[in-house]
A protein has these predicted regions:
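Short Gly/Pro-enriched turn/cap motifs at secondary-structure boundaries
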Residues: 56-62, 114-117
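Residues embedded in well-ordered beta-strands within globular domains across many folds
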Residues: 8, 69, 86, 169-170
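Gly/Ser/Thr-rich phosphate-binding loop
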Residues: 1-55, 67, 74
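Conserved ATP/PPi-binding loop(s) of AMP-dependent carboxylate-activating enzymes
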Residues: 62-63, 76-112, 150-151
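Hydrophobic alpha-helical scaffolding
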Residues: 8-12, 57-59, 88, 145-148
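Residue-level recognition of short loop/turn positions
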Residues: 72-75, 129-130
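AMP-binding/adenylate-forming catalytic core of the ANL superfamily
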Residues: 91, 96, 106-109, 117-186
């Protein structure tokens, strides 16, 4: 591991324990960078920047050419609190559309409906005052038990405040099975 310079983590926010494990058991001076992007753009919105400090639980900043911010539901930019991760500029890896979506309506609905002209990626995030970002989970994963819309990130935020909880998963389950109009959150 002597020649190891960087480790990139992706898929979900890196747990504090995993961050500490890499530095304690792999290599203390490795550049450990969490990244966030998507298969739809074949790239990253946020990630590791070798010239910036690495902070446990944070992604260091926007990748080259990405004008990233966090918005409230009303479209105002916010710092230090959670909201919707957005990209405010066109970029080279944006898909130009969806296959079979001749009028572009599905494409616009997927990314640009929430904030016209601005890519909303579907991640619940906060832009820290340090400049880094924290990804809290998906914002577009919504449960709808009894007609009440609940974002899974809202539940994760509360559950993860408990020291006893290391990992959690939130799903909607039809309950009882013979009554599909009733959903319990597990």
């Amino acid at each position: 591991l002597a020649s190891l310079k960087a480790v990139l983590s992706t898929g979900s926010p890196l747990l504090t324990q995993s961050f500490d494990h890499v530095h304690a058991d792999w290599k203390a001076d490795v550049h450990l960078a969490s990244i966030s992007g998507g298969t739809d753009i074949c790239g990253c919105f946020l990630g590791g920047i070798p010239t910036l400090p690495v902070r446990r639980g944070e992604l260091q900043g926007p990748m080259l050419g990405m004008d990233m911010a966090v918005y409230t539901a009303e479209g105002a930019e916010i710092r230090g609190v959670a909201g919707e991760l957005v990209c405010r500029n066109a970029h080279l890896s944006m898909p130009v559309g969806f296959w079979g979506d001749d009028d572009g309506s599905r494409y616009r609905a997927a990314y640009f409906e929430r904030f016209p002209g601005i890519w909303a990626h579907g991640d619940f995030a906060s832009h820290q005052h340090s400049g880094g970002f924290i990804i809290h989970g998906r914002s577009d994963t919504t449960l709808n038990p009894g007609g009440v819309r609940i974002g899974t990130a809202e539940i994760y935020r509360q559950v993860e405040k408990l020291d006893e909880v290391v990992e959690s998963l939130v799903i909607g389950q039809d309950w009882p099975p013979q009554n599909p109009n009733d959903v319990r959150v597990v």
